[in-house]
Amino acid sequence: MKRVLTALAATLPFAANAADAISGAVERQPTNWQAIIMFLIFVVFTLGITYWASKRVRSRNDYYTAGGNITGFQNGLAIAGDYMSAASFLGISALVFTSGYDGLIYSLGFLVGWPIILFLIAERLRNLGRYTFADVASYRLKQGPIRILSACGSLVVVALYLIAQMVGAGKLIELLFGLNYHIAVVLVGVLMMMYVLFGGMLATTWVQIIKAVLLLFGASFMAFMVMKHVGFSFNNLFSEAMAVHPKGVDIMKPGGLVKDPISALSLGLGLMFGTAGLPHILMHFFTVSDAREARKSVFYATGFMGYFYILTFIIGFGAIMLVGANPEYKDAAGHLIGGNNMAAVHLANAVGGNLFLGFISAVAFATILAVVAGLTLAGASAVSHDLYANVFKKGATEREELRVSKITVLILGVIAIILGVLFENQNIAFMVGLAFAIAASCNFPIILLSMYWSKLTTRGAMLGGWLGLITAVVLMILGPTIWVQILGHEKAIFPYEYPALFSISVAFLGIWLFSATDNSAEGARERELFRAQFIRSQTGFGVEQGRAH
């Protein structure tokens, strides 16, 4: 049981233990011209792709789903590119650098939600939906209320994730490039808007694919050079790391991340079910032609991400040997220059020199751009498709819907820049944890039960979904992270850092209770419609494929 709890505790988002690069003050580094030049090459190339994509975006289908013409392999790379953030790359490597073996369990925790997506969600989501997961949730339920709830859940998750990414972008670029924080935030915001505004999902997908390839190449090269240093022997790798690490043999012992069983379960559930409720990830399943390609997308994405997180483990131990024991990378006080999250960046310099250091720094920036572009498109589609076209102005033309979507992109971009500047010196690490908790407590229960439970009604979905969302937010505010560390109170009202265990339970219980007690004629009609939905979800009958889907 203790091993299980250890593993579950390790599945929390990077924000809890690996967020020093995205929270508080950072030590600005000298201007890195190699990194800036390489990043400019990446920007010019991706803007060229955006121009190419803009010539092919002629309809709503093209803008939201790239015309449904992305292959399973391409989509798998894009999903991996959307999910593998710069903070997970630097943060997990830093956790292995400081804690050893626990970092491996931690990195594997990022994958626990993907079997759920593969076996329970991907195919049915593609067969039932068109542009957003709200299409699936509202398939047999009342369009208006369900779309409002789904859009609110999406927008809250997107907003929290976007703030964390923008602040993280500013901090990381200040660390890696030596650029001013405000310049970095504005640069990320402007590029993000350009990708999404002109290229839509097609440009966003290819930016994410390129970023994934660059990140996988860079991490593979670093891991190869580390293993070459130890004669391609894991025994030598671990022995040398234990010999130079201050904790010695203790870095090979698990369990250092466990606080208590409730926190472990709550964190584990939050990441596992939260992944299956992230709107910018779910949107990718509508970019492929059919359910078979959607399933292949998850298969490839899981493979790429699993490989990547194994590499971060090798990189972390390599940093212990080649960076931790090298005084060149320490300041006068004996601490790592720039903080522990710079371990992977310093290792890039140690194994590949200044040129490769510039490459890894540019890849870290590209990683942020790929993630924020996906978030922005998900937020814009929630407003334009779910709210505008299906609630506030039913029957809106494609042109009107696309105009609203692009206006939303501009508004989201400006808001993201402003909030990124305002939160510069705030501890925003909790925001990613809260985003996962809300995705797990509001989005995931509604998606899952709308596809699998025949007795679900609009009444149950609405009351249970809102209860889950509100519970997650309230418990997070009353918990130690916000109530004590940010608001300055002496003791937290809610004793646990992450609320997912409780808010998910409230959501599922609420959905079951209010659906089971719904005796209305509308509820009976919605239950009867489940059979037709089930047939389509299993067979794909009635789903248009390719460009016209």
From Swiss-Prot:
Segments on the Periplasmic face: 1-32, 99-102, 169-182, 235-263, 321-358, 425-427, 485-493
HAMAP family with a match to the protein in the record: Acet_symport_ActP
Single GO biological process annotation from the record: sodium ion transport
Family label: Belongs to the sodium:solute symporter (SSF) (TC 2.A.21) family.
UniProtKB keywords: Cell inner membrane, Cell membrane, Ion transport, Membrane, Sodium, Sodium transport, Symport, Transmembrane, Transmembrane helix, Transport
Cytoplasmic compartment spans: 56-75, 126-145, 206-211, 287-297, 382-401, 451-461, 517-549
UniProt keyword Cell inner membrane present: yes
Membrane topology annotation: Multi-pass membrane protein
Taxonomic lineage from the root: Bacteria, Pseudomonadati, Pseudomonadota, Gammaproteobacteria, Enterobacterales
Superkingdom to which the source organism belongs: Bacteria
PANTHER family the UniProt entry points to: CATION_ACETATE SYMPORTER ACTP, SODIUM/PROLINE SYMPORTER-RELATED
Function as written in the Swiss-Prot or TrEMBL entry: Transports acetate.
GO CC annotation terms, alphabetical: plasma membrane
One Gene Ontology molecular-function label: symporter activity
Name assigned to this protein: Cation/acetate symporter ActP
Major location category of this protein: membrane
Organism field: Escherichia coli O6:H1 (strain CFT073 / ATCC 700928 / UPEC)
